[in-house]
Amino acid sequence: GFGSTGKYSQRPAFDFIAQAISGFMSLNGSEKTGPVRTAAPISDLIAGLYCAFGIVSAINARHNTKKGQVVETSLTSSLISLMAYLSAEYFVTDKTPKKSGNDHPILSPYGLFKTKDGNIAIAPANDKLCEIFLRTLNLEYLLEVDLYKTNSLRMINRNKLNEIINQTTELNTTDYWIKKLNESGCPAGKVLDMKEALNDQLVEDTDMVLSLIHISEPTRQSL
């Protein structure tokens, strides 16, 4: 869980503990929920991927050096490595990043918005996409409002901006907005549950589900 050397090396661990100690949980959820773990055992999965990549890299290096290498990974280090720009923000500002829920910690507008029949995830990840997003919603006038002219200002006034956006997105269905936004070039998608996701056309198109045939048991499906 913590690597083969150092203070924590002999401590027992599972994914949940790694999520807690790595700081990962502290960034999930909102101020109301407190720390929240991810539904999937992400440290187990990421550590396994890093290990596989390390093994392949060591095998490739052996062709040139004729020497083997020790490949090691840990649950906690794997999660810490995923902090990316969040850790960069801390190193530069010395400020601990706060939970942002479904909002983005450094971008606005960005997140989950209400529709006539549910919710929609929308990700205008730069100024150009923000302009496209607001124009698609017929809210381009906001681009001229002093409160929202830059991303920094939109972050400061995010609650009010989200309120205005929600008032518009609630007028039509999720599918309506997904079509409109994707056609305009703005990334948007529906929030699917497990059943919906595994039966979505994307899963079929990418051959993600396998049929496992057993001689004495019914055929099972698996990813």
Go through the PLM ranges and name each one:
Residues S78, K128, L192-K195:
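Alpha-helix/helix-capping structural signal
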Residues L79, T150, A197-L198:
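Short secondary-structure capping/turn micro-motifs that flank functional sites
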Residues N182-T206:
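Conserved PLP cofactor-binding pocket of PLP-dependent enzymes
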Residues G1-I120, P124:
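Active-site-adjacent "lid/gating" segments in soluble enzymes
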Residues Y8-Q10, L153-R158, D200-E204:
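Short secondary-structure transition/capping segments
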Residues S108-S184, A188:
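Aromatic-enriched alpha-helical interface/lid elements that frame and gate functional surfaces
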Residues Y90-P97, D200-L212:
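Short, surface-exposed loop/helix-turn segments at secondary-structure junctions
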Residues I213-L223:
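Residue-level detector of conserved catalytic or cofactor/ligand-binding positions
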